[in-house]
Amino acid sequence: GGIYTDEHANLNITKTIDNKDGEIEASKSIELTAKTLANDGSVKTKGDLTVHLQDGLVLNNAFQAGGSLDFKTQGNLTNNSQLRVGNKLSVQAANIENTKEAEISGNETHINTNTLTNRGLIDGALTVAKAVTINNLGTGRIYGDHLALQGDTLNNLEEDNKSAVIAARERLDIGVDRVLNRNESTLLSMGKIYVGKTLDEDNQAAGKSTYVHNHNGVIEALNIYDDAKSKAITFNTGVVENKHFFLETENVDTSSTSVFEYRIGNDSTIYGKDSGVYKVKQDNKSS
């Protein structure tokens, strides 16, 4: 079935909206409030979209909003879709999983959750992700012109031989107490990187974190926007541990040179070919 309007649509449902193979479309805006959204179907507007739920949601068919999207659920969100909006995208849930082929992106992208697990793409001109734990794994990519992360723990880790990437096109702020970047995973900024304990009101790193552990990973700030080339990376942390655990060494014969050396009799002295002349005088005795 379908619900259509050229104006604003306001759906306030106390229990469940079952939108299997259904369409909810409004030209100007949609406000959808319910306990449960089952079988997400198509929810589409040229304007702003608000979706507030009590129960969790597995999103297989992306919401479509030409303006902003404000999504909140008291449960968990698993995103399997290409969730892109034209303006501001705000996503809040108990826990959020953005799967391998999925995307969460807007002009501004704001994420608020307990545990964020990303194996897909999160992007925005401004990207701000706040969570207790941020897990960016394997195929996971978190991008932003200005990218700001806040949490107790950030794990930027390899998975299934893929290395995760967190990258800012201009500025990267990491306001996270404990950071682990591992096995060729990358923390990158085309501009500068700032590391602290939390984010301030301008989404810039503030305070002193406990540690940054870079284990076989890459942390790089290209600093291309600063003509003066001032400090590219600022760590305000107790410990920076930068280790390569899998360094292998071997002896390689790159060249060889012939050397002539000699010694006389039982003499312990070793002479080179240019050491001079050694004369031996031996008395012949007969019995």
What residue spans do the PLM features occupy?
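Binding/recognition "hotspot" determinant
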Residues: 1-287
